[in-house]
């Protein structure tokens, strides 16, 4: 399950901006941080959720596949289940996060690894399983080789179908959302076009609009999960039925049997108390596009919070 962090130490007087925290990767052993010992929770289940910027169904892979046209992942989340305390955490990752991206040519030959926005990694692939596997590898490496146990990628066509299948999704808005003519504080049930615009829209002439969209995505995802959870209480096969409604727009390495098992497990989890996180950092303007740079110290603290348990 990957390698685990070596010791990281930070004394009381250090500022979080200093670079003298040794970078860690997953290995057997405990982590010393700010005077406490932490142990990686090996029982965590972590799944990568990708939202792919395409209205088309998942493409078939054949001899004509162009491995430069896998499609960008506009939404990137980790969904984690902690069986020790029955909590769910969702970690949002900014699409513009600058990290090592493996480039391939149209015939799927490896070209080189470059620093670029995380969202493009899915594009260097077949738009199917290979794209997902490459995105999963890149996200794992960004988070110090964090073990990821499965992936689900959803194209925009899946969003329409799933949103309608659950009867629309009710959200409360923390800020004005002009694209659906709603203001801060409103509680609305999103159907059809409104759900699409709510999730997809961002102002291209407004700096850092991707992070505002990410906040909307987090609100929607939490509300959607809650509704699915309520329906699953009444019908344990509900998540599998949802998957089947939208399966031509979804790529996943989670089998139907595994979905059923996870659904039954989740009934014992605290769905009201889902913890929402974002990989910390800041957006700056690059030469052409916005670039999001991770704050490594805050990232470590978040990883310890979600994936580790204090042992002293």
Where do the model's predicted regions map?
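Non-catalytic, solvent-exposed segments at the cell envelope interface
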Residues: 1-312
